Regions:
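Bacterial signal peptide processing site
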Residues: 20-22
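Small-residue packing motifs within transmembrane alpha-helices
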Residues: 7-9
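Positively charged n-region of N-terminal signal peptides that target proteins for export
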Residues: 1-5
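C-terminal motif of bacterial Sec signal peptides marking the signal peptidase cleavage site
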Residues: 15-18
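Mature, Sec-exported extracytoplasmic domains of Gram-positive
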Residues: 25-207
């Protein structure tokens, strides 16, 4: 079976209203793709900064701390060096990916053209969502600052949402939560070529 690759291109368009992301099985432009699956909220509410259940938040934070723990030694080895050398930062990031992928979940690097490991789970989640089947998938991102970003995509049969969590290291090399947020995905599309694009709900004027 020919191995596929998934690229993540994060385009945060804060011009007025939109925040968009693109995950693709290749680098093909998603425009004019056939057989797209588009989902738009029928009665969109604000859809951003949604409340997070405390038990769920604890679960997510604990998971992030566990992942940070398994890459701590790699970060300690590169700490300070990667800040001045982009190549070194990418080496660190790639080594982190190799460790994180062992849990079986999809993982990418924070550079725009990083290949996603364990892409099959993301692919299955999206195909199931096309069939309006409930499900979720976790995508980890190894960042060049030595931290991680965790994105949990969920589909309830009607709408898709994403819970994003970011952790970095303190000066004492302890994991620090910088943010956790839950937002609905206003619109998404998954094409036959493996391109996954979505637009998050964000504040709109006059908010």
């Amino acid at each position: 079976m020919k191995r596929k690759s998934i690229l993540l291109v994060l385009c945060i368009g804060m011009i007025l209203t939109s925040c968009e992301s693109k995950i693709s099985l290749n680098s093909t432009d998603v425009k004019n793709e056939k057989n797209q699956k588009n989902t738009t909220m029928e009665n969109p509410d604000k859809g951003y900064n949604l409340p997070i259940d405390e038990d769920k938040k604890k679960e997510v934070v604990n998971d992030c701390e566990e992942i940070m723990g398994i890459v701590r030694d790699i970060y300690s080895e590169y700490n300070g060096i990667q800040e001045a050398d982009q190549n070194t930062a990418e080496q660190m990031m790639n080594r982190m990916k190799e460790i994180i992928k062992q849990n079986g979940n999809p993982v990418i690097g924070s550079d725009h053209y990083s290949v996603m490991d364990n892409y099959q789970k993301m692919e299955q989640f999206l195909k199931s969502a096309e069939q309006e089947e409930k499900g979720s998938v976790i995508l980890y991102e190894a960042d060049t600052d030595g931290g991680i970003t965790r994105k949990e995509y969920s589909y309830d049969g009607k709408e898709m949402s994403v819970m994003s969590t970011k952790m970095i290291w303190s000066e004492d090399t302890e994991p620090v939560l910088t943010y956790i947020s839950l937002s609905k995905i206003k619109e998404w599309a998954y094409t036959e070529n493996g391109n996954f694009c979505y637009e998050l709900c964000v504040p709109e004027p006059p908010e």
